[in-house]
Amino acid sequence: VPLVDLPVEELRREVALVTQEHHVFVGTLADNLRLGKEEASDEELLAALDDVGAASWFTALKDGLETELGSGGHTLTPSQAQELALARLVLADPHTLVLDEATSLIDPQAARSVERSLGAVLSGRTVVAIAHRLHTAHDADRVAVVEDGRITELGSHDELLALDGSYAALWRSWRSE
């Protein structure tokens, strides 16, 4: 079904965007998470936080899911806010996801772990990941190299390495660092 033919409400339910800029709303952690799925149980909220690697900071919150966030409440770090946005995504369970540098604020090793967890949780969905970290591209079914606004290479990681073009040069440079 072409996207333009979908009713806006269905489109918003089936397609989700997560960027590197996230908003934490005034309210509890549970309130912020339930923006992804209004009727989610506390167990589902905890599972979503665990799926994105947020357990390390979440378990330290004295009031747990009832911790007040935002103005006058607990302040999340940028990486914690990014994990919160990803947990919302897990709860929303959309068919199609656009991840625009969605783990850029998380340290590279933790980001790798989060991406693997998301891969398992979001299996079977269409994911468009816009990333500058090459390990993200490595795990993709297909990689598009964009230069000056145009796709210059398209294929799997192995196919692009065999082409010995821009992607292969970036990969070799990154691996030698």
List each language-model region with its residue ranges:
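Conserved H-loop
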Residues: 39, 55-62
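ABC-type ATPase nucleotide-binding domains, specifically the catalytic core motifs of the NBD
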Residues: 34-42
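ABC-family ATPase nucleotide-binding domain "signature/switch" substructure
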Residues: 9-21, 29-32, 46-52, 66-164
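Well-ordered beta-strand scaffold positions
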Residues: 1, 38, 72-74
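Receiver (REC) domain active-site loop signature in two-component systems and cognate sites
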Residues: 3, 35, 103
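The conserved phosphate-sensing helix
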Residues: 26
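C-terminal boundary and immediately downstream tail of ABC-type ATPase nucleotide-binding domains
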Residues: 54, 162-177
